[in-house]
């Protein structure tokens, strides 16, 4: 919530001095098995409350002080190619939330430039493959007031291992990326002052190219096959 983020910003400054790097990285993925027209408001409110409003609260709590101290800095918002570049039909809530993060990040960059601030912005796409985190078990942190519908079907995937096993049963061998690799790549790109922190994944890039081509040519939207 905004109050806790404001308190965190004040604590960071009192403990460590001026903040120069802000990583808005919290994210959740609800267990999605239903089409949009059957989803429940609680699922949307929980995902957007963390994935979108969490980014917004971080920006509003930290960026004004980062601009004021005049020493420069950088905001890094964690996004996903699923939402920023393509939209997977199996995850309507998650992909919609990450599309919002992409837009917020671009606008923040442009507005800081218009303000002639030396606070810069980057957008991070963890990868290049599925990252071994606990994102698939995010339901463990879901607040009671936004509880999942007890009648909703159980999702078969609650860990990266579950996903790997399911894809393997379909004849698809997925690769994974360790969080430490993402962190190292991110820091290296920050040193280069890059906006796009996006490791190379040829299948994802081809899916994005196909989508852009359909926009330019006004042709039918392609199926974003990234596996």
Q: What are these regions, as identified by a protein language model?
A:
Residues 59-60:
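A short, exposed helix-loop element centered on a Lys and neighboring polar residues
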Residues 1-7, 41:
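The beta1-alpha1 cofactor-binding region of Rossmann-like NAD(H)/NADP(H)-dependent oxidoreductases
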Residues 18-19, 66-80, 116-120:
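Active-site loop of short-chain dehydrogenase/reductase
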Residues 76-100, 105-106, 110-114, 127-130, ...:
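Catalytic loop of short-chain dehydrogenase/reductase
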Residues 111-197:
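SDR active-site lid
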Residues 33-36, 40-45:
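Substrate-binding pocket helix/loop in short-chain dehydrogenase/reductase
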Residues 11-22:
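A glycine-rich helix->loop->beta "capping" turn
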């Amino acid at each position: 919530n905004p109050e806790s983020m404001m308190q965190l910003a004040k604590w960071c400054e009192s403990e460590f001095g001026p903040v120069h790097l802000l990583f808005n990285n919290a994210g959740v993925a609800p267990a999605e098995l239903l089409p949009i027209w059957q989803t429940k408001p609680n699922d949307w409110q929980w995902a957007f409350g963390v994935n979108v409003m969490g980014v917004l609260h971080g920006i509003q709590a930290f960026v004004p002080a980062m601009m004021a101290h005049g020493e420069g800095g950088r905001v890094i918002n964690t996004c996903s190619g699923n939402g920023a570049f393509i939209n997977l039909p199996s995850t309507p809530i998650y992909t919609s939330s990450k599309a919002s993060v992409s837009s917020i990040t671009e606008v923040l960059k442009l507005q800081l430039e218009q303000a002639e601030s030396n606070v810069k912005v980057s957008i991070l796409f963890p990868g290049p493959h599925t990252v071994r985190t606990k994102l698939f078990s995010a339901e463990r942190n879901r607040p009671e007031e936004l509880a999942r519908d007890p009648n909703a079907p159980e999702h078969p995937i609650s860990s990266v291992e579950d996903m790997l096993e399911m894809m393997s049963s379909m004849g698809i061998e997925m690769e994974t990326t360790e969080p430490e690799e993402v962190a190292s790549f991110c820091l290296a790109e920050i040193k280069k002052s890059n906006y796009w922190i996006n490791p190379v994944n040829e299948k994802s890039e081809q899916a994005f190219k196909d989508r852009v081509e359909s926009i330019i040519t006004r042709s039918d939207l392609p199926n974003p096959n990234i596996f």
